[in-house]
Amino acid sequence: MRVRRCAIVYLEPRERLGFDLDGLLAGGDGTVRRQQWLAHAPHLDAPVPIDAPARECLGQLSAALWVDAACLAGWPEGVLDWLLARGLALAEAEGQSAIADTRLREDYWWGPAAMFHRAGRWSGEDAAAATEAAGLATATGLRQHLGPPPPAVAERCSEEGRLRLPRGQASDFDDLLRRRTTCRNFDPARALPILLLARMLERAFSAQAQWRLDTDTVFLKKGSPSGGGLHPIEAHLLVQRVEGLAPGAYHYHPLDHALEPLPAPAMPIPELARVAVAGQHWFAGAQVLVVLAARFGRCFWKYRQHPKAYRAVTMDAGHLSQTLYLAATDLGLGAFVTCAINEVDIERELALDPLGEAALAVCGFGWRADAMHNAEFDPAGRTWATPMA
């Protein structure tokens, strides 16, 4: 059997402080320090606690070259089997960990980006409940518990030293920008006409043109910019209330301007919508939710193990969400975007590979409700006449 180390692994000395009453009574300060080494490998679902012998042996393995296990006879007994069982060392015969590790290598991930991406994923989180329980659901609660925030504006000189610029004459586009706001109140009963759904998808995600170098090398032109012109973000829809369209999961085809029905998720769509946005019920009721899923291999094909590539992909998601906002505002619809999502649950339900095509954010759009039951940030009162709570 030949073995090697996984492609990417980082070691963390994690420290936890606790209180020990006996230590305090004995004359100490009562502080107990507990330290544990963790191995973080982005092809694994969770960090692995690791002891000193395993840590040292793991560092001796090459991540690139296979070595015969017989050459490791001098290792402490059981260490190689322990590393193999946990996916930190890999045997040449493929297992599940080896398949995920191969995906990392083939898609040219930059190590720190892969680590960041995998470590920040949620499963089963209810961000809304946690925020409310902590008293952080309102601006008043935020300030009360966290103190005042840093200033809203960074100032680099005195007021007298600023060079005032002329204000432009407002146009229809200026009005559109001023009306753009995040919707937290969707109509729970009204269905969206399929023509509006089609218009939204066409504006936000469709390919306006394409350029072919060869049959296997195609570049798309869309309404939003993309790093390297590669457009790695895919739109996966959770349709809840659209006239003439069955509720379910769909993938949008940007060239054909068509929906591709996906296998039915195990969760009912309304439940999946709420889980997807981590319990943010004010978003979960949108007529249509859009999972922005990144095909990292599309971007990393050009930007191989590049320190800026992951940042470019996340910027793409931001560009698309703003285009979706403006399209919705122009059509009289509400819209939202959130990165507080349960990626693990989304990817499981939609059969997405967390390293190959992973959820980065969830957008949504649809009809606004007649009344504002959930507070919205609309200080100028362009959407609601009701003052902010």
Residue ranges and their predicted role:
Residues P261, F300-K302, A335-F336, H373:
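Extended hydrophobic-aromatic, low-complexity segments
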Residues M1-Q280, Q287, E349, D353-A389:
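N-terminal accessory segments that position/regulate proteins before the catalytic core
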Residues T181-A191, W301-T314:
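Short histidine-centered catalytic/ligand-binding loop motif
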Residues A264-R298, Q305-P307, A312-T314:
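Hydrophobic alpha-helical transmembrane segments and adjacent short intramembrane/lumenal linkers
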